Amino acid sequence: MLQITDLVPPVELFGDYVYFSSNSDSWVAHAAACAARYREELNPNHVVEIASNDGYLLRHFADWGISHLGIEPAENIAAVARDSGIETRTEFFSEKLARDLVSERSADLILANNVFAHAPDTNDFVAGLKVLLLAEGHAVMEFPYAVEMIGQGEFDTTYHEHVFYFTLTSLEPLMARHQMRITRVERTPMHGG
């Protein structure tokens, strides 16, 4: 695992965010393919997406009539998601938020695309996953892979939003610490692996 030690407070980075995921055609196509695959393979009843942005991914589940919730800390972007019919809470994901949410409903699928590297407290993040996820559920996370970043010279993925750069060997003990395990690993061409 690699990490940046000079941290910018998350509220400064994400309080009023300017990146809208739906502006990237390649990312939207990737999200659509992933959503279809998750629906086919996992058949979820309730999907929670962490850092759901403008609802680009959850809108597929909404269109299929699948219960969903987006968690997006940037109010300006969360408002766009809500305006398009995506139920969205404007907060940073944490174990505390997960405990609040689980009192209403647990998730059998949690999606976290390009957010885990942003979390300054990975233990709190993973603890939140464990709390919110049903015992037979799945958490799917996409993030830049440190091995690809170094091996392919992808240093353009290094910036203040990304606090951590993970390897599989750094993730396994982190997940185990919270009684979770990695069951599948895939490399994708999106965002550095």
Predicted segments, located by residue:
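Glycine-rich phosphate-binding loop signature in dinucleotide/nucleotide-binding domains
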Residues: L42-N43, V102-R105
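Conserved S-adenosyl-L-methionine
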Residues: M180-M190
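Conserved SAM-binding strand-loop segment of SAM-dependent methyltransferases
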Residues: G85-D100
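Extended interfacial segments that mediate partner engagement and assembly in macromolecular machines
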Residues: M1-V80
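Hydrophobic adenine-recognition pocket in adenosine-nucleotide-binding enzymes
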Residues: V115
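A short glycine-rich, Lys/Arg-flanked "PGG" loop and its adjoining helix->strand segment in the class I
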Residues: N123-V140
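Short, glycine-/aromatic-enriched active-site segment of Class I SAM-dependent methyltransferases
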Residues: A139-F164, L168-S170
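A conserved beta-strand element that flanks and buttresses the S-adenosyl-L-methionine
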Residues: D108-L111
